Amino acid sequence: MASSQSDSPPLFDLPVRPDFTIEWKIMREGLAPVAGLDEAGRGPLAGPVVAAAVVLDPDRIPEGLDDSKRLTAEARERLVQEIFEVAAAVSVASLCAASIDESNILKASLEAMRRALDGLCVRPAYALADGRDIPPGLPCPCRAVVKGDQRSQSIAAASMVAKVVRDRMMVRTGTLMPHYGFHSHVGYATERHREAITAYGPVTRLHRMSFSPFKTSGEEDRILASGDAAELIASAFSAADGLNGRDAEKEPV
């Protein structure tokens, strides 16, 4: 099994913006290329968790890479398009609400990261994963980097790709279920989303029934997604699976 380690430097050491310092240190030890791993969608009540793996070209790093949460939606879209165009490799993977319910959100997030790394069209010699936990079963050594999307440009790029892809998936799903408002909250527990759940009930294959308020409310009824709605949910949630860098350059999702 590949060796792994957890990296938790002091928070006051955070750079103004993520840079390539960690990657260069690893590459100088003869471990190249380096992949960044991150996920989006751990907190929402609905939808998949999406992970991305990105191998940046050190000579073509997009300007303005940052923690995706610090950027506007327009800035994220622009940067993600550039990442798909200039990165050495990009891969995206997702796990649906049912998979999250079967295990838990942490295990599902780590599994999505593992699948994203496996989907890269190049074999990384090392990986950097955002957070405190390392995905099990990786084919290369990995370091967990706390606040990694604020420290490492590779992780920041993966964070942005995962966020944009997941948002697009939820917006596409919401086109057939406009009363839930997925186009605006993309599954998070906003007041509008909670009101829609109260009014219409949770949606099978979409809402995470192991999450509050479902687990604590004793809610048994679900809307069964059928016909076009079921097909859209299935296609939207699988749209990112198996995406690799060369395919992604033309159309991110």
Swiss-Prot record:
Residues 32-223 form the RNase H type-2 domain. It is an enzyme of class 3 (hydrolase). GO terms for molecular function: manganese ion binding; RNA binding; RNA-DNA hybrid ribonuclease activity. GO terms for cellular component: cytoplasm; ribonuclease H2 complex. It is found in: Cytoplasm. It comes from Chelativorans sp. (strain BNC1). PROSITE patterns: RNASE_H_2. The gene is rnhB. Its cofactor is Mn(2+); Mg(2+). The keyword Manganese applies. It catalyses: Endonucleolytic cleavage to 5'-phosphomonoester. Manganese or magnesium. Binds 1 divalent metal ion per monomer in the absence of substrate. May bind a second metal ion after substrate binding. Belongs to the RNase HII family. A divalent metal cation binds at D38, E39, D130. This is Ribonuclease HII. Endonuclease that specifically degrades the RNA of RNA-DNA hybrids. Keywords: Cytoplasm, Endonuclease, Hydrolase, Manganese, Metal-binding, Nuclease. It comes from the Bacteria. GO terms for biological process: DNA replication, removal of RNA primer; mismatch repair. Its EC number is 3.1.26.4. CDD domains: RNase_HII_bacteria_HII_like. InterPro entries: RNase_HII (IPR022898), RNase_HII/HIII (IPR001352), RNase_HII/HIII_dom (IPR024567), RNaseH-like_sf (IPR012337), RNaseH_sf (IPR036397). The keyword Metal-binding applies.
